Amino acid sequence: MTQITLTTPDDWHLHFRDGDMLGETVPATARLFQRAIVMPNLVPPVTTAAMALAYRDRILAARPQGSNFEPLMTLFLTNNTSAQDIIDAKAAGVVAGKLYPAGATTNSDAAVKALDELFPIFEVMAQQGMLLLVHGEVTESHIDIFDREKMFIDRYLSRIVEAIPSLKVVFEHITTKEAAEFVAEASANVAATITPQHLLLNRNDLLVGGVRPHNFCLPVLKRNIHQHALQAAVATGSSKFFLGTDSAPHEKHRKESACGCAGCYSAWSALELYAQVFDNLGALDKLEGFASLHGADFYGLPRNSGTVTLVKQEWTVPEEIILPNGNPIVPFFAGQKVNWKVKTA
């Protein structure tokens, strides 16, 4: 197959950041994706309906002229989140609440420190029809970073799902065999997103032959057995797994430093890289469900009506992109060849 046409896809997990950065990130995603679930981990975090609406306005202002791209907003859950916060957010069009264990990722220090205290909030979310999006890692310093996802499933996620079966839960950016199995075996109200980097790479790509800071993300890349389990999950075509890039931009100097930031900025190549993965797996027929259908269905939103066409044509991801403030950012897969390319009119 040398060409494939898909229903216009959506990105069910990304980071736009804020300020000048929106001038880069919003057009990069809007070029292909109709909708995107926007993460709320700004400084300060998006904890109220009013903050979500204001952030949405800033994103809309950064859309390219003529674009009808739609940002889908989320609420940053903390131990101070109230039932009224959830009700107000739902009324304002916020589609989901995001659970970050405190310290799990960029700008998450204000997040949840006592998870059990949030169960009443999860109940309200279920009643309101608001989804729970989960960064599924424990954060205690004595727990090995490669074990934190499995530990979160055992300690928390299994209990949340069991206690509130009507709550729709997205286990975001899963990275392990255990996570893929948990989602596959859970009820129809549990799904997961998978990033391009966790399908394409494993921890050798981070650590062998030198540290590769632009492959560093959280949750961290795992052993190849976990990479293969994720590939197997998407190759089944199961509606429980769908596209979420976790595209997460950081300026070059913040990645290439003594204490580099976590995140892969994949917006310029994500769909093409997913196509490469599915092609390599002999599962191109499953790409449309993963990229364009399963997420919308799980969120209870209409499927998109447009289409995007990819052709089998080699191109090279740019080494750098210059941000509106003049600083460079290194995109994911920089300088590497990709086998699929979006067909432009």
UniProtKB/Swiss-Prot annotation:
Sequence positions that bind Zn(2+) 1: H13, H15, K98, D246
SUPFAM superfamilies xref list: Metallo-dependent hydrolases (SSF51556)
Binding site for Zn(2+) 2: K98, H135, H173
Pathway(s) it belongs to: Pyrimidine metabolism; UMP biosynthesis via de novo pathway; (S)-dihydroorotate from bicarbonate: step 3/3
Keywords tagged on the record: Hydrolase, Metal-binding, Pyrimidine biosynthesis, Zinc
Top-level EC class as recorded in UniProt: hydrolase
Highest taxon listed in the record's lineage: Bacteria
Amino acids binding substrate: H15, F16, R17, N41, H135, L218, H250, A262
Cofactor binding summary note: Binds 2 Zn(2+) ions per subunit.
Family under the similarity heading: Belongs to the metallo-dependent hydrolases superfamily. DHOase family. Class II DHOase subfamily.
Function, in words: Catalyzes the reversible cyclization of carbamoyl aspartate to dihydroorotate.
PANTHER family (alphabetical): DIHYDROOROTASE
Name this protein carries in UniProt: Dihydroorotase
Species per Swiss-Prot/TrEMBL record: Shewanella frigidimarina (strain NCIMB 400)
